[in-house]
Amino acid sequence: MTVTEQCILYLASEKMFYRSIQKMTVTGIIAEYNPFHNGHQYQIDWVKKELKSDYIVVAMSGDYVQRGTPAILPKHTRAKMALLCGADLVLELPVQFSSASAEGFSTGAVSLLDGTGVVTHICFGSESGDTGRFLLAADLLNEEPAPYRTLLKKHLREGRSYPAARSQALCEYADAFHLPVSGREIAALLSSPNNILGIEYCRAIRRLKSNIAPVTLKRAGAGYHEQDLCGDSAPSATAIRSFLKQHGSFGLLSNKIPKEALEILSYMVKANAFVEEADLDLLLHYALLSSGDTYEEFLDISPEIAARIKNRLNEYRGFVQFCDLLKTKEITRTRIQRALLHLLLGIRSASQRVPYARVLGFRREALPLLNEIKKRGSLPLITKPANASSLLSPEASAFLEENTRASNIYESILCHKSGKPFKHEYQKQLVIL
């Protein structure tokens, strides 16, 4: 075969692949996998069966999660769990977004999936299972009609936390203006963290003018914050973390976590290679003492939170205890956790979009998809962070460096606990199955 014939054949195959990728269903999943469990497996299986997805792309939190704490296992380990259990490609959601409020978390994750140029759907779990209701609530919150804003301000003045004030304002607005959903239905929709995230995913899709279609899957198993492990084959990640803190038998997890993921989790815990909130105790105390009066420079630290930190600093005993000490009726514990984590990691500002797509791992069968992302995506695809500067703008490079510092802090905690050698973020290898 001549070189010309080879070129013609190559171009023809590329054209055929382009046509096939145009018809493909590529579903994005936004997750923490903290850790991976049967509920996550159920979602992946459902996406493949019901949506007929050709590929599943996961936007996964890195080493820190949305409630403002470190992930229990390192990001590459959790990415491997996901790939073994059916995901095709895992991208990192950087700490600036993974540790943000529901709105910031969702905006970052949706912008990341949208930036690949190939994701056609986003599937998220919810207690509702009705995508239409999520889109209605999302449009209402994006538009913020004047009567709704008035109700929101009223409930904030009454001393409610922002989530509680928003929920009450939406319920009253729905009833007063006879929306297709009642105030009671709105209240139910806003009653769980998964539903709230679902609304925020839909808001982000609308704001970013993305063509991605949202699809919600009704959750099976325990609720998001349910701490009871017994009697449920799909427990919450909260229940599993709580169980691990009690150092129970791994045999009790055998029907709650997929075999491949459980083997990894068991190995890491036995090696003491996992991170808990208490592992931040000394680092956070140092950060608080060395920050002087500059607390408000850090992301999510309001003047009120800064004042509470200053007034109660001498009572500091540890991360968990200090969060409990600082929370109020108006300021939730999760908001305090995020604020303190940002101070510890030195994160001072937020961003509107993720400026790159960092690959944590992929299945070999997904190589054609990676090639298509390189062609069609609007984000630089990063497989080797050490070489990323040539692909990134100065602002994006600074963003990556901030995320790298945060991951190196996580790695230092992990090494201190497990006794394993420190490995810089730039030295870590992709997970390829």
Predicted regions and their residues:
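A glycine-rich helix N-cap at a beta->alpha junction
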Residues: L84-P94
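Short, high-confidence coil segments that cap the C-terminus of an alpha-helix
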Residues: L51-S53, A87, V118-V119
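Non-catalytic positions within long, well-ordered alpha-helices that form the structural scaffold/packing
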Residues: K48-K49, L83, V110, D114-G115
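N-terminal catalytic cores of NTP/NDP-binding nucleotidyl/phosphoryl-transfer enzymes
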Residues: Y18, K23-R78
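Active-site cores that bind ATP or allylic diphosphates and position pyrophosphate for catalysis
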Residues: E92-L433
